[in-house]
């Protein structure tokens, strides 16, 4: 999908009038600007809002992550002991009367126009045509505990074809692709990238084999396409199975339908195993997708900075 600006994104999701009033590059606002647009442009008006609405992902680890980012940017304070399972019920100081709306992670971009702000995972922001580096009002840095991982069922970690896929994902070729394609929206975290291959794997024995991987569209499937080319040079087929949710990619690996998955960060995997009784383990940590705060009805963080 080609990237569109935040203004164009909001326009196609139903608030063209508000977006048009927030013209860039020194342009003046239309005298016919809506009340919502005027409020977004004027801190004096914004400060009088009764509450500020923020959409966040509703799964445990991503909600806690979103709340931590909001807290860091001054929206409220969360109980010190809430940790990686914090929910909106753990907010203890809320001077701006922030109302948290919990939404399924993939759907958060679709409600952006209805909220003052939304906290969106980078993969879903990218899929929605947003550029996390350019469009987010605030964004995590790359030093995050939320590393996206390659996962298999416990007991299969030493499978040669899974090790071959891990080496491809940890490669310099993947690093170069991520750096060029995403320019900070996705951050490669492997300290010593491989040449695409694992010296302990007998690639001749894998010639003609297939390794399957469940993944979400962007950036995971796009990154796996680089791995497909790397593995093809050794006669290995990478079967990429695309999913749009955060549940089935784990279920199909747990029941043996698919060898691996690549879509989730480590805290989500840990929480999923605990909640569902699955036996999934990390093979390799590949990248971080910095979570960002995006403006819907508001175009800056002025309402919480005054």
Locations of the language-model features?
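C-terminal motif of bacterial Sec signal peptides marking the signal peptidase cleavage site
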Residues: 21-24
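A conserved helix-loop-strand patch within extracytoplasmic ligand-binding domains
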Residues: 40-69, 73, 163, 171-176, ...
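Short, well-ordered beta-strand elements
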Residues: 50-55, 206-218, 236-242
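Ligand-binding clefts/hinges and TM-proximal coupling segments of bilobed small-molecule sensing domains
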Residues: 65, 79-86, 163-202
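Short, polar/charged alpha-helical segment
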Residues: 68-75, 86-89, 217-248, 252
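Short helix-initiation/N-cap motifs at beta->coil->alpha
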Residues: 82-110, 240-251
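Periplasmic-binding protein-like
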Residues: 126-158, 190-198, 283-295
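Extended ligand-binding regions for polar small-molecule ligands
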Residues: 141-142, 147-181, 297-300, 304-306
